[in-house]
Amino acid sequence: MRFWITTAALVAAGPAFAQQVAFKPLLEARARWEHLDQADFDAASDAVTLRVRAGLELRKGPWSVLGEAQGNLAVVDDYYDGLHGPANRPTIGDPENVAIYRAQLQYRSAPLTVTAGRQRIGLDDERFVGAAQIRNNAQSFDAVRTEIVPVQGLKLDLTYAWDVRTIWGTEGRGARQRGVGGHNVFANLGAATPLGTLTGFAYLVDQDEAEVQGFRLSNQSYGVRLAGARAIAPEAKLRYQLSWARQSDYHHNPTRYRADYWLADAALDVRGWTVNAGYEVLGADGGQTLTSFQTPLGSVFKFQGWADKLTTTPPNGVRDFYAGGGHGWKKLGGIDTLSLQAVWHRYQSDRLDQHYGDEWNLLATAKLRKTQLSVRYARYEADRFAADTSRFWLQMDWVY
C-alpha cells in the first residue's frame, strides 16, 4: 500500500514539472548465456536470457521523478530458476519476469538528498545492503532514504525500507518471495580522515515473513569500516579496506545468537597491473543453522567467489583468504578498454577449522562505446562443504 501511495505522489507532482523540464531516457539491455554444472545434480543447467530495462527520468531544478521497468525473458530455459523448471538441474536465479524496478521522487541539493519510493540502494561495498545487479531481476527497495552532508568531509546516510523487492520477481513464493516486508533501518555516518573514509554503521534487517527461514534472517549489525587509497610512487597506488561488525538476532527472530565479521583487504595498482589479497571472516556462534553472520540484503555475488556456494553462511561460519591480480588496457585495437582478472579463494570454517574447499575465478571484459562484453568462469573444488561446481558466463551489456 505504501508503495502505491508513493507512486500516486509522483503522478500528482506532474504539474510542477511542466516548464523547463530535462528529460533523460533510461534504456539498457543484457544478453547472457550462463552454464552451471554441479556434481550433486543429474544434469547441468543452461540459461540463455535477455534482460531489458526501460524508463524515463524528469528533472527540474533540485526535483526529479524517475520510473523504470525491467523484464527478463528465458530464450533457452534448460535450468531451474528457483521457482520453475526441472528440479534435477541446479538453480540459476533468473526467473522470467516483468516488473517495476524503480519508481521514485527525489530532491537533491548540495547538503541534502531525499529519495522516496522504489529505488536502488548500494551502501559502501554492498556487503550488507546492495542491488544484486548480477541477477537479471535486480533487487530494489521500497524506502525513504535521506543523505545529509552538513559539512565537507562528513556524510550521514539514513534509510527506512518497508519492503525489499527480491530477485525472484513477481511470481516469487514460499521461501523465495517476490517481496519481503519489514521495518528495515540502514544508517551510516562517514567521515573523511587522512587515512581514508571512516564509516560507522548500523543495519537493522527485518525479514518479517515466516516463510523466509521462519524470521531467522532478521538481524542487527553494528560496525565500523575504513576505506582509503594513497600514492606510494609516481605510478603506484595502494588501496585498502578494514572492517569489523557484530551481529545478533533482531525483531521476530526466535534464535538468540551473536557473531562477528572481519575484513582486511589491500590492492596495489602499478601501471595498469593490479595485485590484491584479503581475508574475510563471517563468524559463527554455536554451530546451529542461521546462527552465523548473515547478509541477506547484500550483493553477495561480489564476495566469497562467483560459484555461489556461500551465499548463505554455513552454521560454522566461513573464513575466506583470497589473492588475485589482473591487468587493464585502454584504447587497444579499437577497443575502449580491456581487462583481465584472476582470483583464488581458500575457504575454511570459523568453528572447528574445517577446510570447505578452494575456488578459482577468471574474468575478461572488453568495452566499446556503449557495449560491454564479458566472459566469466568459476571453479569450486569441494573438500568438506558443498559439491564440485563449474560455472561459466558469456554476457553482453548495452546501456543507452
Task: Please provide the spans of the model-predicted regions.
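C-terminal beta-signal and terminal closure region of outer-membrane beta-barrel proteins
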Residues: R384-V399
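Signature for the C-terminal beta-barrel architecture of outer-membrane proteins
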Residues: Q20-K24, L58-V65, R108-V114, A132-T289, ...
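Flexible internal linker/loop segments at domain or repeat junctions
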Residues: L290-N316
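Surface-exposed loop and membrane-interface regions of Gram-negative outer-membrane beta-barrel proteins
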Residues: H35-L50, K60-Q104, I121-R135, G169-E171, ...
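Positively charged n-region of N-terminal signal peptides that target proteins for export
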Residues: M1-W4
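Short glycine/proline- and aromatic-enriched beta-strand/turn motifs that initiate or cap beta-hairpins
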Residues: A22-D42, P314, R319-F321, G325
